[in-house]
């Protein structure tokens, strides 16, 4: 069952073409990047003391990669997204799903219980007013609850792939911190992730993969194509090897930034 908290009609395509969410789900769910982000997030939750069966809302759950990982770990997880089509694809008996637009007023159910943690993984870069979105995330958690946000990093890497996803920006630490400034949340720390990918993206920036007549999902799929085996194994190993360094805050740069905050 899908609950609806948002008021009015949300324009999901203004954030990312819904066809990308629907048509490429199977590809994304087995892609090393999304799987590695889910593993890092689960490890981070554990280090924050947020263990199963804590209640967690995954805002912008999209293809459901992290949502499924949370469920398998035993969390009481709720998936939230602006896209009704994406939610329909994830819907099955026993799963908690919510239609939620962080850019618009919303009204949780009368019996709403704040969550122990809220995730917004690669969400706020799609939103013009990212600070307002972060403040709304704070409304979802109980006092003492955690908010984890991840964003694409390094503005000089902004490229066609960002554009077709509806990204407004890539972040530096100071711009990510600014999004939390008046949110009512206390920003505890931030850290880089994906350091090993920076040289790869710098080497290919400025190149385009769109072909004449391409739909957004066709171009997106082209970006998701991996080199032949054993490249996928190497990618998984690279993410695994740097995970502890990322969580320790010892990476000096990365293609993503994570922020960890709590509600006082």
Predicted regions and their residues:
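Conserved N-terminal segment of class I S-adenosyl-L-methionine
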Residues: 1-121, 131-134, 220-228, 232, ...
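Feature marks short, surface-exposed loop/turn motifs that line or immediately flank catalytic pockets
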Residues: 86, 106, 155-157, 196
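A short His-aromatic
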Residues: 122, 126
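C-terminal beta-strand of the catalytic ATP-binding
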Residues: 261-264
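Short, glycine-/aromatic-enriched active-site segment of Class I SAM-dependent methyltransferases
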Residues: 25-27, 147-169, 173-181
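A short glycine-rich, Lys/Arg-flanked "PGG" loop and its adjoining helix->strand segment in the class I
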Residues: 131-146
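Conserved S-adenosyl-L-methionine
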Residues: 185-195
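C-terminal helical/coil "lid" or tail adjacent to the Rossmann-like core of SAM-dependent
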Residues: 197-236
């Amino acid at each position: 069952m899908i609950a609806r908290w948002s008021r009015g009609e949300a324009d999901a395509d203004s954030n990312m073409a819904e066809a990308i969410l629907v048509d490429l789900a199977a590809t994304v769910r087995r892609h090393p990047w999304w799987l590695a982000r889910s593993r890092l997030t689960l490890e981070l939750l554990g280090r924050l003391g947020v263990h199963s069966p804590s209640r967690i809302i995954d805002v912008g759950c999209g293809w459901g990669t992290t949502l499924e990982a949370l469920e398998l770990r035993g969390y009481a997880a709720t998936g939230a997204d602006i896209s009704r089509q994406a939610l329909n694809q994830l819907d099955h008996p026993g799963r908690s799903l919510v239609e939620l637009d962080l850019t618009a007023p919303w009204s949780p159910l009368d019996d709403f219980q704040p969550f122990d943690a809220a995730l917004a993984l690669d969400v706020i870069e799609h939103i013009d007013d990212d600070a307002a979105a972060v403040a709304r995330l704070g409304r979802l958690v109980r006092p003492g609850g955690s908010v984890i946000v991840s964003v694409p990093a390094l503005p000089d890497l902004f490229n066609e792939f960002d554009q077709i996803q509806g990204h407004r920006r890539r972040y530096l630490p100071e711009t990510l911190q600014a999004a939390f400034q008046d949110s009512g949340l206390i920003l505890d720390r931030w850290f880089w992730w994906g350091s090993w990918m920076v040289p790869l993206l710098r080497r290919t920036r400025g190149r385009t993969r769109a072909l004449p007549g391409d739909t957004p999902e066709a171009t997106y799929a082209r970006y998701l194509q991996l080199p032949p085996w054993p490249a996928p194994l190497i990618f998984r190993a690279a993410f695994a090897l740097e995970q502890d360094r990322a969580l320790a805050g010892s990476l000096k740069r990365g293609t993503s930034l994570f922020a960890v905050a709590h509600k006082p």
